[in-house]
Amino acid sequence: MNRILGLDLGRVRIGAAISDELRLLAHPLETIPADAQATARLAEIVREKKVDHVVVGIPRQMNGRIGAAATEALQFVEKLRAILPCPVVTWDERLTTVAAHRALREAGKNTRATRGYVDQVAAQMILQGYLDRRQHVAHAAGNEKWDSQ
């Protein structure tokens, strides 16, 4: 089974996480500079890691509205959809970066020194939330093979 790629978009860096082959667990993958080569690197990852599905976190405002950061993220999603050979879906990522900072602090990590890793952990949280939701929906529908949805 192919993997799912999760992305935490930022103006400076893009955190990437990848699922295991069973699509149950998300793992930090890498941090990519948010520059002109970012889409090419993501296309490379999709090819190398046999990704057939990409989940992009959209930073909605706390009231659920789409702000400037979410608008930029949605524009990037459209660029990805134009170049990637697989579906690109969006996922609400409110407070994942805050949660990633907290998790790293609680693990005794200096988040300033591991700035790029915070983005990977945020991407991992986005992807894990997506994987958990898919599994929950499939289980509630009585599907043993939740990936068929």
What are the roles of these predicted feature ranges?
Residues N2-L7, R11-V12, A17-Q149:
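Phosphate- and other anionic-substrate recognition elements at nucleic-acid/protein interfaces
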